Amino acid sequence: MSWKRNYFSGSRGSVQGMFAPRSSMSIAPSKGLSNEPGQNSCFLNSALQVLWHLDIFRRSFRQLTTHKCMGDSCIFCALKGIFNQFQCSSEKVLPSDTLRSALAKTFQDEQRFQLGIMDDAAECFENLLMRIHFHIADETKEDICTAQHCISHQKFAMTLFEQCVCSSCGATSDPLPFIQMVHYISTTALCNQAICMLEKREKPSPSMFGELLQNASTMGDLRNCPSNCGERIRIRRVLMNAPQIITIGLVWDSEHSDLAEDVIHSLGTCLKLGDLFFRVTDDRAKQSELYLVGMICYYGKHYSTFFFQTKIRKWMYFDDAHVKEIGPKWKDVVTKCIKGHYQPLLLLYADPQGTPVSAQDLPPHAQFLPYTKTCYDSEDSGHLTDSECNQKHTSKKGSLVERRRSSGRVRRKGDEPQASGYHSEGETLKEKQAPRNASKSSSSSRLKDFKETVSNMIHSRPSLASQTSAGSPCVGRAGDQLDKIPPRNFPLQARGWETESTSSEAKSSSSSKYRPTWRPKRESLNIDSIFSKDRRKHCGYTQLRTFPEDAAKEFTPDEVSKPTANDIKDGGSRSQHKLWGTARPGSHLLEQHPRLIQRMESGYESSERNSSSPVSLDAAPPDSVNVYRDQSTKRPVGFVPSWRHIPKSHSSSILEVDCTAPMTSWTKTQPLSDGEVTSRSELDELQEEVVRRAQEQELRKKREKELEAAKGFNPHPSRYMDLDELQNQGRSDGFERSLQEANSIFEESLHLEQKGDCAAALALCNEAISKLRLTLHDASSSTHSRALVDKKLQISIRKARSLQDRMQQQASSQQPVQPSASLPSQGGALPQPTSEQPITLQVLLNQEAQLEPCKDTELGATSSFFHSPASCPELHSSLIPESPVSSVSQHSPPGTSSLKLLTSFEVDSVNRSAFHRQGLPKATGRTEMNSQHECLPLDALEDRLQGHREDNSCCSKFPPREGRDIAQDQLFEGKKNPADISMGMPWSYSTGEATSERVIYSLNSPSSSSAQPSIPPYSSCHPITSAASSPVLHAADPMQKLNQHVQAQSLQTSLTSKVVRSSEEPYRLEFPSTKGLVRSLAEQFQKMQNTSTRDVIGSQDRSLPNGVRKSSSPSDFMPPLSQGPGREHCRWVKQPRSPDGRERPPCWEDPAAHPPLSMGSGLPDGETSRTAQPRLAEPDMYQGKLPQVTDIRSKELGSSVNLGTSLPLDSWVNVTRLCDSQVKPSAPGPGDKSSSHDSHPRATCLERSPILLHPHWDQDTEQETSELESLYQASLQASSHTAYSDWRSQDVAWQPLSLAGSADGMGRRLHSAPGLDLSKPLTAEMEHVLYEPSTVPVSQDSSNVRKKTLETGHHCSSSSSLPVIHDPPVFLLDPKLYPPQPQFLSPDVLMPSMAGEPYRPPGTSRSVHQFLAMCDRDETPQGVKYTGRTLNYRSLPHRSRTDASWGPGSETNQHIGARVLTMPACKPQLTYTATLPERHQGLQVPHAQSWGNLFHSPSHPSAVHPGSPPSSNLHVPLRSTWNSGPVLGSRTPGPRRIDMPPDDDWRQSSYPSQDRHRSPGEERIMFALSNAAGREQNRVRFLQHSRW
């Protein structure tokens, strides 16, 4: 309000000036009051703070030494104790438990202020005052309490007269005397009047505040003319005393009213009593100015207090135990209230010159006999008395406002019953003293006493009356004259008053136009009364209804039926009352609810009833008056507080006239009332009715609370909307409208989805998401609304993901499957998870031959990559929507990733054709691929995975790198336990499609990881192979051995890396699968297209390379054989669990197992690697290798995402993908199978990428990931061409290009570049991939990948399942899924699926080498000695800016560019430490020790053509561990770390290689080293093509 400033400015200084600081002893430092959870004592604490800080009360209370003690329910004693603590305690926070307990016991019968139950602060304040009155005053003599030492009545109570005077006919209603502790005003009326005043006055002034309050208190409270002349007149209130503290209670229509800010602005800090009431009879009151010193506020079911600390002259804020200094100015409070949305509830205006009460008249202590509890019940609140009952009823009704009113209802005293009731709690004492039975007589006697006292008051103040009525001839007249003839000047004054108040009336009427703004929207929090609709119509503001229809009905008949002794004005008044009563009941009846009995502001209702009462005080005999009022009030009072009768304002003339009349009438009435049995019986009935109704209200309250609790928060959320939102009511409507629209759109989307129109459903779902996001902004101010919208938004997002997954799956299923149908089908078929649930899975991104290292070094490499066909089929099944589940379940550790895949993809979406291809039954939706492989919830999947890990012996954890690898693996299987195989969780491919790579899933159980390491990779990896396949495999084995020996170092390096990584990383990388990013279908399709393009190229390359690869690396080629039926058999064979009961991913096997991998790489433990689960490690190695290859292949892929380029440090997925891609090439299958396997590698890559996806994967990361993925796939292609080399866990030699021949992913890519369909040299493609902007759709973005990585294998599986992957074979997690394929990496880059898994576009098949994706946080698999290395920017492949070899022509370099990716073993936050050797240096192992073998040669594989022999693969000695030695490399001591920003923009031509030494524990090597049969040749070619 514009005039608020005037108020504040005028009063601000005066407040400070008037209140002189007290002595330090006067008030102790401010202390807080405790409010423990569940106590809900904030309302009491607020009232206590107000009482303590009111100087007048504190000083007066200090003087009181005697009281009527009530024992443990004595509020006076409790209050004394707390005040003493306030004064003397050194504690900053004091307990209020004693007072809370006493309060609860005092009002136990009324069920008010009970322990643990929130109540109303204003009512509590009022009742405390009344309790004090009862304790220190003689109630029998003080119905109106004239005791000088009664703080409540001497300092707080307002003695008022209320009367209506008709300006037309001069008729007057009987004056209604009453006392109120709190003057209640409707906030709605206040705001309406403020608007009216502003409209009428140009310059508002602080003096307007009093007038504003007066107009607001009577606004809309129009009465029918007492003589029923048809006029509507306003109540007049006259203040007869001079209270030093005025308490203004603001009645709110809702807990979260939109008027809060307006009300705060409209508050003035200075209040003149003369302005507050129509007339003031006390001279002191006329001159007194009170200043705002305290304010109790409410917000969010919590009360707090602002108080002006006179000692420091600053406003303080008390919030239970918290005390805060606000500032010296009121505006500081206003600012805080507005920011906090506080609703002022109680305003305390105090006279700065106020004095404490006089204690001279204190009765001796002996006079105060303690009341026994038996006599004293909580009813003493006065509710049980005539008026008390009314009050009690109202209070019981639960409306806090009612309680406040009841204290204000002291006015009820004005109503006979109110006599006692005005002390809302007061009369109970009296009643208790007298038996309840006697309550009739006592109540009647009290009524008589009250009337007498009132009449005496009136008589004793004739001068006051005369003063007020200046010139009124009737001042001295007898009541009879008054009864018969109102003074002439009275009507005139009335007219004048009407004229004065017309403005307010007009305002009220005119304010109706503002009603919409002020109309309360919600159930009132503190208000017991509701604005009646009728009043709204008439007055322009909603009036509080005090009584229900019954009450109204009762009231009308009572009034009608009750004959009045004097009918002089009776007829008119009676008829009036009838009319008024009926009209009123209508208004009140509207929405009347007993619990909703609302406190009228300052007795709107009571005044109405009084005015409407048929008998005027003069005309009606006191008895009749009592009867009428009691009945009319009482019955209504049952629902309506007696304060309905409370007079609101009287003109001075009225007072004069009424003074005598009331005296006479009251005197007449007294005897009658004494003798009247009827009145007593009525009182009793009224009490009973009140009690009954109060109980009903309590029951209703309880039911409502129960309903609210059942609904979770609030059945009417709008009630709890924030003030900001309420202040913008239009916005709330918009919010609801938007929410409804979003809901309808979402429902339509569901409908379309049911019809099968996923695209349209997704579009609508996205639209709903957009609307919900907008709505979320609108609901930002409402916690409840925000939660509601957020919930719906999450549901919509999940649905969008589901739809995208389905579409991707459909697309994948539609895409042609590679020759190794099982792989592609698996990859494509992998259902995309409707929603990804975080599951920690350790996944060898791809498994070729099982990683179990062959005891023989040469076999070791092969065997480590070797995976039985059975495992492949299982892998395939896992890849398939159901199969992923099964594979996951089967491969418990790897299963994690598979679970992730499952999570990512819906089994439904799995390509069923893939199942058929795999020889697996086509499973619909989430049907089991294998009996073992059911689609289960992630938890179930984990269990399954663990279970299936055992079962999936066939699903060896290591995909056969190549036919030879598979053969070796099979051989090793023979050597090793199938349990080992079962440990391995490679995805099975269809028969003949043994994936060269297997994905090892490790559920998030360290045991599985540890167990897996212990299990020989061979057994875990080797699937049961058909005799033919196994012979082939065996046959392949020798070749593989040779190639492996050649490539052993590289493969071992890669495998070792894998093993190391896997060993370091428990299989069960427990990565919470991040929810797959919901990507637009466009993005998905983009990825698919990009991936498919790359895959097509890659698959072409791969397919060519497969043959070529076979030729180039016989061992690699051998795996394709294993991919054959034998592999299929392996696929179906269940791998026994590791001793842990978990399948060990081959990677996790001991370094000994990995040494076979190190054959080619030169790992001393190549054989051991084979023996161990090198395959498990191998997939990792492959993945690592794949990254190496991927760099090459990425470039080669060109279109493929530049995983390496854009991959953020934490983008595990990309690294994994790179590794997978490399791995896939490492395990070339026979001929086309390889290419199909390539697609499988793609799937593997998908699996891989999810494996390491970081939970916090973001789109930037995704972009980087996609770039890295491109590189990775390129390297994968190259690595897929190269045979997987066994690698020891210790000797995780990072062999970017040390892929032998086509066996190396890089080699494969190289091969594919020259001889494969790849049009670009691998280097070029890799370079393109590396440098090209991430072509992968956003879904493939590194962020997605990263997130997927955190999800670990799950996402990988999911992404493989993503329909985006046209080539189902692309399964990041399970190399098994991919039959051994040529090492040529398909140009396609694995793309992150919506599920978060990378996938290759359909059509690009590539065998994926097993890659164990490990997070830094994951534990190292037990028994695995591999040092882990975190993938980082340096560790990831990049090309040095200076290296021109990275150009498209430098395939070899590109292959080399794919660098070993080291991944922290099991840490969810995956850090990729991909070390990228300088181009000129070729791939370099971070440490000579770890890389020594891997990098025997410059690690620069010569560009390998698709037809190039395995020798083309780079050979990198594995002897050096990541941490053990500097990376070989002319340019940089070691490979570059991707996790660290390169010195130069690594996306540009150069990658400064920085060797970063990581402790094995800190990082896991995530690179797959491919066998390097022709590693030297590859190295030479690579060196030729690239200059590191």
Curated annotation (Swiss-Prot):
Keyword terms, alphabetized: Coiled coil, Hydrolase, Metal-binding, Methylation, Phosphoprotein, Protease, Thiol protease, Ubl conjugation pathway, Zinc
Binding site for Zn(2+) 3: 166, 169, 225, 229
Feature: compositional bias, Low complexity: 499-513, 601-616, 808-826
Residues binding Zn(2+) 2, per UniProt: 133, 145, 150, 153
GO-annotated biological processes: protein deubiquitination; proteolysis
Bias (Polar residues) ranges: 453-471, 1510-1524
Record EC number: 3.4.19.12
Enzyme class per UniProt: hydrolase
Coiled-coil region(s): 682-712
Transmembrane spans: none
Record SUPFAM superfamilies: Cysteine proteinases
Region feature Disordered, mapped onto this chain: 382-519, 555-577, 601-624, 801-834, 1089-1182, 1221-1242, 1491-1561
Active site feature: 42, 302
Function comment: Deubiquitinase that specifically mediates 'Lys-63'-linked deubiquitination of substrates with a polyubiquitin chain composed of at least 3 ubiquitins. Specifically recognizes ubiquitin chain in position S2 and catalyzes cleavage of polyubiquitin within 'Lys-63'-linked chains. Not able to deubiquitinate substrates with shorter ubiquitin chains. Mediates deubiquitination of PLK4, maintaining PLK4 stability by reducing its ubiquitination-mediated degradation.
PANTHER family per record: INACTIVE UBIQUITIN CARBOXYL-TERMINAL HYDROLASE 54 (PTHR22975:SF5), UBIQUITIN SPECIFIC PROTEINASE (PTHR22975)
Entry protein name: Ubiquitin carboxyl-terminal hydrolase 54
